[in-house]
Amino acid sequence: MAVEGSTITSRIKNLLRSPSIKLRRSKAGNRREDLSSKVTLEKVLGITVSGGRGLACDPRSGLVAYPAGCVVVLFNPRKHKQHHILNSSRKTITALAFSPDGKYLVTGESGHMPAVRVWDVAEHSQVAELQEHKYGVACVAFSPSAKYIVSVGYQHDMIVNVWAWKKNIVVASNKVSSRVTAVSFSEDCSYFVTAGNRHIKFWYLDDSKTSKVNATVPLLGRSGLLGELRNNLFTDVACGRGKKADSTFCITSSGLLCEFSDRRLLDKWVELRNIDSFTTTVAHCISVSQDYIFCGCADGTVRLFNPSNLHFLSTLPRPHALGTDIASVTEASRLFSGVANARYPDTIALTFDPTNQWLSCVYNDHSIYVWDVRDPKKVGKVYSALYHSSCVWSVEVYPEVKDSNQACLPPSSFITCSSDNTIRLWNTESSGVHGSTLHRNILSSDLIKIIYVDGNTQALLDTELPGGDKADASLLDPRVGIRSVCVSPNGQHLASGDRMGTLRVHELQSLSEMLKVEAHDSEILCLEYSKPDTGLKLLASASRDRLIHVLDAGREYSLQQTLDEHSSSITAVKFAASDGQVRMISCGADKSIYFRTAQKSGDGVQFTRTHHVVRKTTLYDMDVEPSWKYTAIGCQDRNIRIFNISSGKQKKLFKGSQGEDGTLIKVQTDPSGIYIATSCSDKNLSIFDFSSGECVATMFGHSEIVTGMKFSNDCKHLISVSGDSCIFVWRLSSEMTISMRQRLAELRQRQRGGKQQGPSSPQRASGPNRHQAPSMLSPGPALSSDSDKEGEDEGTEEELPALPVLAKSTKKALASVPSPALPRSLSHWEMSRAQESVGFLDPAPAANPGPRRRGRWVQPGVELSVRSMLDLRQLETLAPSLQDPSQDSLAIIPSGPRKHGQEALETSLTSQNEKPPRPQASQPCSYPHIIRLLSQEEGVFAQDLEPAPIEDGIVYPEPSDNPTMDTSEFQVQAPARGTLGRVYPGSRSSEKHSPDSACSVDYSSSCLSSPEHPTEDSESTEPLSVDGISSDLEEPAEGDEEEEEEEGGMGPYGLQEGSPQTPDQEQFLKQHFETLASGAAPGAPVQVPERSESRSISSRFLLQVQTRPLREPSPSSSSLALMSRPAQVPQASGEQPRGNGANPPGAPPEVEPSSGNPSPQQAASVLLPRCRLNPDSSWAPKRVATASPFSGLQKAQSVHSLVPQERHEASLQAPSPGALLSREIEAQDGLGSLPPADGRPSRPHSYQNPTTSSMAKISRSISVGENLGLVAEPQAHAPIRVSPLSKLALPSRAHLVLDIPKPLPDRPTLAAFSPVTKGRAPGEAEKPGFPVGLGKAHSTTERWACLGEGTTPKPRTECQAHPGPSSPCAQQLPVSSLFQGPENLQPPPPEKTPNPMECTKPGAALSQDSEPAVSLEQCEQLVAELRGSVRQAVRLYHSVAGCKMPSAEQSRIAQLLRDTFSSVRQELEAVAGAVLSSPGSSPGAVGAEQTQALLEQYSELLLRAVERRMERKL
């Protein structure tokens, strides 16, 4: 049937082509074919069906076909066997259909210039291709004669093509005016029907004409007469079969099943929902056979109707409820028993197998069920599978545990995490998991357990799939989901980090959550446990907030250290042990690599930097090869760079991708260190030889970028996960597996040699130097920085495979090994040069850890064993293990409800209320219903034997469990007589003007015909295709890094109903990986999830860092412990639930950052309000001398994020006005203006300060030490970063006692004192809606205090205050004083100004005429504030002057107030004189005169009263 090269042109080209060209091309083709055949796709765990058009069934063999990314999965429900067709074009499969004989499969794809392809099902090869669409193929169908194929394009294409695929010509074509969702051929092949938005159209084929004409003819179409249903969205259509072959059935999104007659008239319809139910409001799909009509509806409902009269027959059982614990569903009663108030996924696709009477259903949580419907009253489940419904972010293989009795999961298990907010435990081996605590469930043969992170079931549904009940995008949190997972080396703990920055640890034995802490302010990109060979039990978490937290897993995950050298997102962090030292390596989007060495620090361990390497490209991922000698880093320029861990030098570089476009996203080495696998943003996977850099295999099949990869422990598989929600299990070639196992055997041989020459040690080591790591912690490693140009280092790199020195040193090292080593002692490079012939050894005994698991799940590789549940050895293992964990395992925290008083979390982490333990999934031991004898593999590489057929394994419900409904609940309705005749009288004029007519309606009218799904019909034409991703991933310039990251919601990972997978849907890379570099560039904020409170470790660390005058080493757990627990406050402070929005009630709207760099005066405004509102803090005198004007700028803090906090603090601390002012003055005294000791401003230390990474970028040639903050020259103040933390309400931070030094920043500015103008120029108008009554208790007094000193700062000028202990200017000016800028405040006479430097002069004040008009409201507010402030001043003076034995400080306060009163009186007299001496004025001036007179009169009365009372007391 092959038609490739069948045209005349191609035949001539083949004849004229020379044999040499043919030979060269065939060699290149063979090379490519050889690379792609090394690794084969064995299993797909995922489904990307987007509607009824994406699911098909072979009517003869029963094969079910569905898309999974760029792969078509051919599934046999009877044998549970998969076959795969890979789309070599790398375009997502959107629609497919079988030919009537089942030999061929037609597929449609998305993207630009998509193709309709015909595949040979048996050969899995392409036989024909048509490329006549532009923007995606919506649906395809074979004609019953298999002669024609109909394909319909997406809305922006709107082309209907009839293709004679064997001749490779389009015989008929036309356009449609509406979005088409489905197509169906009539049984006699005379017409086909398309359905869509307000669209049912019948297209007629004249076979006599199309067969005679070789050119394309117009396709004739007639619209269906919809009558009163013309405004509906028809989601699916199916032509009748058998006796109803002349009828056409379709469903609407509103839940109607309609029947059209052969005259295209709407004959009758029935409402799919019954009277008493509200769950089936939406219908998605339909499937029609001779006996049944199946309608897929919302909430997992499938209705069965009789096609002859549309009478209701029955309702199929619903699938699992959302949030079901599948490990507990081990019996049929658990599946078919309804759960009260449960929510079920929608049915989005149906296909019927008439031979077996099986109905396959796909639901919008990406699950698939096959139901046996031979008896509609007793429906049984044949097969089911549950998959991730959104992007899969990470995959981890369950480690090989030395003591198999301590293993929590069976061998070959792996763990994935996803944006659907679940962590899933998988095991694809054919043998059962009955030896573990988890039994096989009846819902999935591959899925062991689902860990639901929270109770939100909305994340389990794919909202991009069709459905009328789509969730509002504003209600969905775009950062929901688990971003990274990691399993502890002993297999007991599972750590996970979500996209909100929360770190969780689950205990795998009971699958209960044992720890939950808000560790970061942004998503956690990487988690890593240290190996036991390091002697440490550490967990490192790295985040987009550029911080690394190191937790001690052996001490209940207490915080050991926080590292902040990186200046951007950290993409990877790894532990290693080399040269007797424990190392930590991290890389990130700031193009830096840090090599750190562990040092003993009291009871814990601290990491200090030893090497710092900077490259010119973003570093996306890193892995350490098994010998821990070298680390491989995947870079943005598609290169893999190999670094020596001990020296930090680059040793090798090779290309990590076969393509010329894209970016390396992930790198992963195999267990032996021979191969390294890479994933590129062009969606391709490659495997390279680690020593030579030669590509040995390539793979493709994912429709989105691969976000994670792992080799299996048995060296037989590579598991890849992707943004398309699919998991691919790849089978490696036999020679690759042999080479890896041979390398592991050589390592075991060397390990045994080391054992004979050295005493054994309780420490388990895997290399000559690993066991020494705990005792060889460096007291102070030498610092180095490799920031030279990359070319120089690479030009002098050493060829590691050609170094015989390594082999010699290896032999010496082996001779001195004092403890047993793991089979990963030496790198492949060293082994390849050792020239030792070690054959493929027999597996080691069970006591020796090797690549083969030993214990209760042992699977012999040679002999054929028959195993069953009746085996005595298996029965013994069914009893729960009561043995204590091994000594090297992590301490297991009890999984019960945890209290706030646990020591570890008191000292380092914020205590959290933990959930009660989940019930164990294990059920009481019982014999299975079916005993299968499963044979094991014969040899290592024999294909898995197929499981036994399951005719008897269908799960049926109890008779009482089957829901029955009265047929009368579904009433068939028909249009009234004359209705259709009145609307459509049969004249052709009405048909010509039908909205569905392609001939009479303008092409652009389709934009008005899809109101129900506006987002589905929109499509961006921006060329962002991943195929040309190299242009999108160009390294940003330094200036570009200043741009703010705009990361929107999560990009769609599945297919979208009604719109193709065009470039706007392929922004996955740009949204989640390219933004790693731009998100945390200097001057741009790190995009942080919105929280009502910020309790994360990162926030507390950044808050504490603000108190450091110079950059110091990161705090240990003891130093951070002081800030870990906020003070207890009344519940009135109001913890707002997460997701309530950016602003708390009464909080100001967000202030947009200015385009220019904020001035230092604006920068100072971050510190002062915090200092003033913590007057009772114990100030640290040791830091007075090192204080600087900007040393208090805190990291990750916005200039306008303090406003809601300030109001919150003011509400918590509400003493009497006199006491409040006295406290403020005490705060002044503690914050007096002292310049730095050297007379120069110290460098600022805010969140955007130059980190080690950014300094290395600025100056690559200098050698940077650890104390980079000790710079003598004054540094330019870094611009204030408007962090998204500004969106948070910060009540918890308000109670932390800040260790801020006493000296106030020298010469504070007006912008520093106003809580309203943070982030704005002083004269900028206030945004409307801001509460103006903020801080009335302080504001006027503060202004009077400042006026008493005679300082009236102008915009962007500085005010010099007294350098003494009392600095009245260190108060805040009122809100009202900023309505028109500080010019409203009249300055005092020059002779009365006590400061040596005057900020303004009387003549500098603006005239009244040049000012905007003062409103009455403003004036009244000013008067009220003035009265309140004077009262407060008087009360304060009375309280101070009334003391019989005043202290020196009280005497100073009294003198200060007297001077202030005198100064204010003189000011008012001067103002009154100016007003009286002015000539006739305008009406506006008259109002000003009245105001001034009123103020003068009132002030004089108050002052006289004060003087009288003072005279009485004196």
Swiss-Prot record:
The modification Phosphoserine is found at S1198. One of its GO terms (biological process) is positive regulation of JNK cascade. Residues 748-804, 880-925, 951-1256, 1299-1336 are annotated as: Disordered. InterPro entries: MABP1, WD40/YVTN_repeat-like_dom_sf, WD40_MABP1-WDR62_1st, WD40_MABP1-WDR62_2nd, WD40_repeat_dom_sf, WD40_rpt, WDR62-MABP1_CC. Residues 789-800, 1032-1048 have a biased composition (Acidic residues). It comes from the Eukaryota. It is found in: Cytoplasm; Nucleus; Cytoplasm, Cytoskeleton, Spindle pole. One of its GO terms (cellular component) is nucleolus. Residues 905-925, 961-971, 1188-1200, 1245-1256 have a biased composition (Polar residues). Expressed in intestinal mucosa, where it is detected in epithelial cells, endothelial cells, smooth muscle cells and immune cells, such as lymphocytes. Expressed in kidney. Residues 996-1011, 1113-1126 have a biased composition (Low complexity). WD repeats lie at residues 88-129, 132-173, 175-213, 276-315, 342-381, 387-436, 477-516, 519-561, 565-606, 614-653, 659-698, 701-740. The modification N-acetylalanine is found at A2. PANTHER family: MITOGEN-ACTIVATED PROTEIN KINASE-BINDING PROTEIN 1. It is linked to Nephronophthisis 20: A form of nephronophthisis, an autosomal recessive chronic tubulo-interstitial nephritis that progresses to end-stage renal failure. Some patients have cystic kidneys of normal size and no extrarenal manifestations, whereas others have enlarged renal size and severe extrarenal defects, including hypertrophic obstructive cardiomyopathy, aortic stenosis, pulmonary stenosis, patent ductus arteriosus, situs inversus, and periportal liver fibrosis. NPHP20 patients do not show extrarenal manifestations or evidence of a ciliopathy, such as situs inversus or polydactyly. Negative regulator of NOD2 function. It down-regulates NOD2-induced processes such as activation of NF-kappa-B signaling, IL8 secretion and antibacterial response. Involved in JNK signaling pathway. The N-terminal WD40 domain is necessary for the interaction with NOD2 and down-regulation of NOD2 function. This is Mitogen-activated protein kinase-binding protein 1. It comes from Homo sapiens. The lineage of its organism: Eukaryota, Metazoa, Chordata, Craniata, Vertebrata.
